[in-house]
Amino acid sequence: MNYALDNGHKWNVMVGRYDYELGNNMGLIYGNNFDGAQLKFADNKMAATVGYGKFKEGDLNDSKTAYGELEGFFGGGSVAGSAVGVYYNDFNASSGVSAGDAKVWGAYASLNFAKKFNLNAEAYRVNYDKASVADADGFSAKLKYGKAKFDTPKSWDLWVNYINIEDGAADDSGTGSWRTNVNNTKGWAAGADYTFAKNAQLQVFQTFDTKIEKTGKDRDELTRAQFVFVF
């Protein structure tokens, strides 16, 4: 259930199962099904979100979490639509075969510039309470030119992306990323999106120079193409 609490639609409550991207940006740690409740306030300058519930996919399945997000929106002209945000999670996490309480602290910045460019960067830390489980950091950056919109046929974009995710800083079975491997991974990727009809898009992805973050050994590269339809 998604319900606006006021006529101006600034206050919104969501209850039940919904798609949750941890950090409300790239969803690297987790971006999948979630059972819970969320309260959000948003206007054209800022947004504040709090929520509580259970992850329903991956290694984090059935782990409970409380989360909070604070975002600010800014810019005019070619910078319009830019944003910065911080987020916090407190949950029962899982890293390989080791599990324990953990806290996530993160921040992101999404900057529009030069009319058609966007630079999106995110950094976070997973602090495990259990002494035997090492804390883990994650970083990702994506530079994009253009903007493929589902409601705008023939719109397109090109992008390049870099990630450096330490072991224990992502859930490969629940991540919102298109990559096969996110946890314990560093490397580059490039891709393109093209809207060939309204609500229909072709997306292509290619990784390169992908390594296991902990050892520096090569990972298998991934080539992927997909059609996405929205209704």
Where are these regions (language model features)?
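Outer membrane beta-barrel
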Residues: 1-85, 135-172
